[in-house]
């Protein structure tokens, strides 16, 4: 693909041969005890959050975690052998009609505030993704009724619970997994694709879905 081709700047993370994964200047080994909400703040702001900052992120996610019923109907209507990645991408696109960025752009939004609408969309989508991913798992693999989100829990514990596992050790494993996969630098297929699609002023629902299409490839 683009191996060795310099095509964009990424300041959120990098992998160094002698140091491993570095996220915002911090070695990943020093972040393994952090919650997803803390990692999100770190990626956005560039520094670790205070307790009040973490609580603010949790409240923001909780306020936008509800997933409309039509999305679950769409997932249930997909073929029984649909690939889970296809279902996740379809679920994200089923939310595109809620895009703040798209609405404000159509209303004549000024260029210098594009980032505000894009951030708002991103937060809303990220808040819903655990419930969408859990629904994909439970529908695709016939695990029974969907388990409603509990906005009072942190993201990793809530996701583990919606998958159907209440074991605290599993929730801790999910938290660690989310931390290790929090950022993909900028030059891999999925992240780069998201950048390219967003550069056409497509909203985050489109750009994230496009990135996942790249991630679904075998390479």
Q: Residues of each region from the PLM?
A:
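Hydrophobic alpha-helical bundle cores within soluble ligand-binding/oligomerization subdomains
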Residues: 1-219
